[in-house]
From Swiss-Prot:
Residues 280-333 are annotated as: Disordered. Keywords: Cell projection, Cilium, Cilium biogenesis/degradation, Coiled coil, Cytoplasm, Cytoskeleton, Flagellum, Phosphoprotein, Repeat, WD repeat. It holds the Pfam family WD40. Phosphorylated by TSSK2. It comes from Mus musculus (Mouse). One of its GO terms (molecular function) is protein kinase binding. WD repeats lie at residues 358-397, 400-439, 442-481, 484-523, 526-565, 568-608, 609-639. This is Sperm-associated antigen 16 protein. It is found in: Cytoplasm; Cytoplasm, Cytoskeleton, Cilium axoneme; Cytoplasm, Cytoskeleton, Flagellum axoneme; Cell projection, Cilium, Flagellum. Residues 281-295, 303-325 have a biased composition (Basic and acidic residues). GO terms for biological process: cell motility in response to calcium ion; cerebrospinal fluid circulation; cilium assembly; cilium movement involved in cell motility; microtubule sliding; mucociliary clearance; sperm axoneme assembly. Necessary for sperm flagellar function. Plays a role in motile ciliogenesis. May help to recruit STK36 to the cilium or apical surface of the cell to initiate subsequent steps of construction of the central pair apparatus of motile cilia. Expressed in testis.
Length: 639
């Protein structure tokens, strides 16, 4: 490498770590990068034929003009090669050791900086005197540390400490959360353990009580077993006596039949029993001789005559009253349905307008007259009342049931009324006369609901005895008893203008029946609680039902599958009714609220005005008014 211009060669050698001895010889200088040597080379002259020449590009070096000789060219090439070799190697710079400033130098520099020359002179004089006197005692005083380095070290240490502090805080928070969670789990398991122990102790106590209870039943069971055997013996004896009595009755009936036909002559008693003679006639009734007018009628003859008269009377009544026939093809009566032709649009913004206080006890059912603006209300006070609308004037009051009334239904013509009661009867009333015309008996428990067939010849009833009955109004007898429900039948309704019946039961099911055969055609499952009421839309394509948990379900009557379920509970839904358009469904709830469901949009509107339970709800003919009956004995008008 060529030395820069203006720099002495010795200086360049010193920078490279190479020096010369006083005699001019080259000396070796060892640096951190290694040893460098300077050798003297003598180039001998050789023939040009023996040398191999290498072309050197002109761009790599430059020789000033006038100094172009072989020695300089070789020197420059060698320097260039060394430079390339040095650049290819990884240069390791020596570590820089910064010497800290001595204390006395720091003080001197501080005094000079502040311009305190006199103080500096005094300090230096006194300091050097001390050094001369004590010598090496001041060598261990140390140096002044570098403030900036110390600050950086402290800052770095501070940052590290802050990071560690943050890490420890996070770990502490996590440990705290784990501790709280563990404590909660411990408390939960402790409480659960205590509860299990209490339940265990309770079950042990109950088990001991049951063992004692069942032990006390053993003597009773033994006594009942003995009674059972005794009753079986009595039953066998009773069966024998019954068979004997049936034989006697059969003989008496045969005797009566023969007497009626004139084949047997009634004996005339003369004196003792042995003198009585029975003469069999072979002719007709004209040859029958009997001295009845000359002898007194005995008790046996009197009983036979009364039995014959009773049987004849019943057979005569039976022949006079014939059973009605179920219609085969029915169409809506235009005279009955004419009042519902002009139905207004659906309405939801009803407001409480009037309160009719009609009964002293809760209202159980309200129904609208098929055509007129009349309303019938039934109550637990054993009365039903006909009310004129919209004034609420009582037009007619009916009494005759011996227990609370549960429901009522108008005859399709509107001239008759059927009522069901807790006295297990159904009564038919003539509204023109205001009196009961027929009482239907046959249920074993309270009757919850009744409904008229569209032809007006049949009435169906639902009872607590888990059965429903179809009554023939003309023959005044039960045509069919519908068995199938496993709990109380709460509601019953005829499908409009058909022979199909719909029942709702406390066994959480709905059933569809054929009234002509009395058989169940289909059962609908879906409710989780007792079904209180079920009804059809005016068109008859949808069934609505509500249960004791406030759940209302809509069913497709054609497919007999559920469409939608609306939960407005947990209060019980007591009754559901459609308006004449079939778009609005009203539900009477036990919490005093009337829920109106829009079947088109699915929205639910609430009517609040009752102070207690709502038992029944019904729309007016055109849907402009709504009537509701509550447990406070009132009927409320909503317009």
């Amino acid at each position: 490498m060529a030395a820069p211009s203006g720099v002495p060669p010795l200086r360049v050698l010193e920078e490279l770590g190479i020096g010369l001895s006083p005699t001019g010889e080259v000396t070796e200088a060892v640096t951190s990068e290694g040893a460098y040597y300077l050798e003297q080379v003598t180039i001998t002259e050789t023939s040009e034929d023996e040398c191999e020449y290498e072309e050197i590009p002109d761009d790599n070096f430059s020789i000033p003009e006038g100094e172009e000789d072989l020695e300089k060219a070789i020197h420059i090439i060698g320097e260039q090669a060394r430079d390339i070799h040095i650049l290819e190697q990884q240069t390791i710079l020596p570590a820089r050791n910064v010497m800290q400033e001595a204390i006395e130098d720091f003080l001197c520099n501080f005094l000079i900086k502040m311009g305190m020359t006199r103080t500096l002179d005094c300090f230096q004089a006194e300091w050097y005197e001390l050094i001369q006197k004590k010598g090496s005692d001041f060598k261990g005083l140390g140096n002044v540390p570098d403030v900036y380095s110390q600050v950086m070290l402290l800052e770095t240490e501070n940052k590290n400490l802050k990071k560690e502090l943050k890490h420890f805080k996070q770990a502490a928070e996590k440990a705290k959360e784990d501790l709280l969670r563990t404590q909660k789990e411990r408390d939960f398991h402790r409480m659960h353990h205590k509860r299990i122990v209490q339940e265990k102790n309770k079950l042990i106590a109950d088990l001991k009580g049951l063992k004692l209870h069942y032990a006390s039943y053993e003597p009773t069971i033994r006594v009942l077993h003995e009674k059972h055997h005794a009753l079986l013996k009595e039953k066998m004896l009773t069966s024998l006596e019954r068979d004997r009595a049936v034989g006697k009755i059969s003989g008496l009936q045969a005797t009566l039949k023969n007497i009626d036909m004139g084949h047997i002559q009634v004996p005339v008693i003369k004196g003792s029993y042995e003198s009585a003679s029975i003469t069999r006639e072979s002719g007709d009734r004209a040859g029958h001789s009997c001295e009845k007018e000359n002898s007194s009628e005995g008790p046996t003859q009197k009983s036979l005559r009364e039995a014959r008269e009773e049987v004849g009377y019943k057979s005569k009544l039976k022949n006079e009253k014939k059973d009605s026939e179920f219609p085969v093809d029915m169409q809506p009566d235009p005279n009955v349905t004419s009042c519902t032709e002009n139905v207004s649009a659906a309405k939801f913004d009803y407001k409480l307008n009037n309160i009719f206080r009609l009964h002293e006890l809760p209202v159980s059912c309200i129904v609208m007259h098929p055509c007129r603006d009349y309303l019938i209300s039934c109550s637990e006070d054993r009365l039903w009342k006909m009310v004129g609308l919209p004034q609420g004037n009582v037009l007619l009051t009916g009494s005759g049931h011996t227990d609370w009334l549960s429901g009522c239904c108008f005859h399709p013509s509107g001239s008759k009324l059927a009522t069901s009661s807790g006295d297990s009867t159904i009564k038919l009333w003539d509204l023109n006369k205001g009196e009961c015309t027929l009482t239907l008996e046959g249920h074993n428990h309270a009757v919850w609901s009744c409904t008229w067939h569209s032809c007006g010849d049949f009435v169906a009833s639902a009872s607590l005895d888990m059965t429903s009955k179809i009554w023939d109004v003309n023959s005044e007898r039960c045509r069919y008893t519908l068995y199938g429900h496993t709990d109380s039948v709460n509601s019953i309704e005829f499908f409009p203008f058909s022979n199909i019946l719909l029942t709702a039961s406390a066994d959480k099911t709905l059933s569809v029946w054929d009234a002509r055969t009395g058989k169940c055609e289909q059962s609908l499952y879906g409710h989780m609680h007792s079904v209180n009421d079920a009804t059809f839309t005016p068109r008859g394509h949808i069934i609505a039902s509500c249960d004791a948990r406030g759940v209302t379900k809509l069913w497709d009557f054609r497919k007999l599958i559920p469409i939608v379920s609306i939960d407005v509970g947990p209060s019980s839904g007591n009754e559901v009714n459609f308006d004449q358009s079939g778009r609005v469904l009203a539900q009477a709830s036990a919490n005093g609220i009337i829920h109106l469901l829009d079947l088109k949009s699915g929205q639910i509107h609430k009517l609040v005005g009752h102070e207690s339970e709502v038992h029944s709800v019904v729309f007016s003919h055109l849907g402009e008014n709504l009537y509701s009956g509550g447990s406070d004995g009132t009927i409320r008008l909503w317009i």
